[in-house]
Amino acid sequence: MASADEVTDKTELDASGLKVLPGLVDIHSHGAVRHDFSDADVDGLRTILQYEKSHGITSYCPTSMTLPKEELLKIFQTAKDVEQDETCARIVGINMEGPFLDPAKKGAHVEEWIAER
């Protein structure tokens, strides 16, 4: 491991009087700025990722709703297809709110889309 004095390509910031935090992780978010992950819109998801990053979120788990399998597969493909760069929070997983739920505790989830197994 090199010492700080040996590193030639570095930028030093004066953080005196400031609080320095690691990037935050958002593990449950359906969307932001008028976009929803379940819309399966690549541009919308990229906008969400940029918004999250601009607010200190560096790692992100977009959350899906209980939907038919075909729709879920399309939504998950969106997460695979979205272009992520340094302006975006990084997708580190997907939070599936359904379809694997107890129908007795389904809340707002549509029962016909809850998987039996």
Please identify what each model-predicted range represents.
Residues 6, 40-44, 110-116:
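A glycine- and small-aliphatic-rich helix-loop capping segment at beta-alpha/alpha-beta transitions
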Residues 1-21:
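Histidine-rich, glycine-flanked metal-binding segment
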Residues 11-13, 25, 94:
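Hydrophobic/aromatic beta-strand patches that form the interior of the parallel beta-sheet core
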Residues 18-42:
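Di-metal (Zn2+ and/or Mg2+/Mn2+) metal-binding site signature of metallo-dependent hydrolases
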Residues 30, 46-75, 89-102:
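Divalent metal-dependent hydrolysis catalytic cores, especially in the metallo-beta-lactamase
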Residues 77-117:
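Metal-coordinating catalytic core of metallo-dependent amide/deamination hydrolases
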